[in-house]
């Protein structure tokens, strides 16, 4: 999870969920190393491939290639899920504490072909989300 969203008031949640802090500026590879090690040990991680909360909602924004690269490198299976109707707040603490009717839709469990590249995986995941949600693609 992006370090800036990991508010101290919720430290017990981050520890309980074994949430991996990620520096989104690309200067810290510790989170990536932990995630790769976890995947190689048959662990599970959750990734938001857009690299943050993007506006407008209801559109499929470009994905960063990190998720696809991790999948290609570790051969991990992907449980494609869509999170929707979350609170739209400027602060994480407000979003976490506001009552909502958020949904999580589990779309498919995907095993990519052995030779798939990170870019191919990223493109396919993005296509599948757009196909499932009927949301337009942002280029």
Tell what function each PLM region has:
Residues 30-139:
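Non-catalytic C-terminal accessory region of glycerolipid acyltransferases
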Residues 1-27, 34:
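Catalytic core of membrane glycerolipid acyltransferases/transacylases, capturing the structured
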């Amino acid at each position: 999870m992006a370090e800036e969203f990991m508010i101290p008031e919720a430290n017990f949640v981050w520890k309980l969920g074994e949430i991996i802090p990620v520096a989104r500026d690309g200067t810290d590879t510790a989170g990536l190393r932990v995630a790769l090690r976890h995947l190689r040990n048959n662990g599970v991680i959750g990734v938001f491939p857009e690299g943050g909360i993007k506006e407008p909602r209801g559109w499929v924004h470009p994905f960063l290639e990190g998720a696809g690269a991790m999948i290609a490198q570790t051969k991990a299976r992907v449980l494609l899920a869509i999170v929707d109707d979350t609170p739209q707040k400027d602060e994480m603490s407000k979003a976490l504490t506001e009552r909502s009717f958020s949904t999580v839709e589990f779309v498919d469990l995907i095993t990519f072909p052995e030779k798939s590249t990170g870019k191919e995986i990223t493109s396919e995941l993005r296509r599948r989300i757009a196909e499932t949600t009927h949301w337009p693609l942002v280029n």
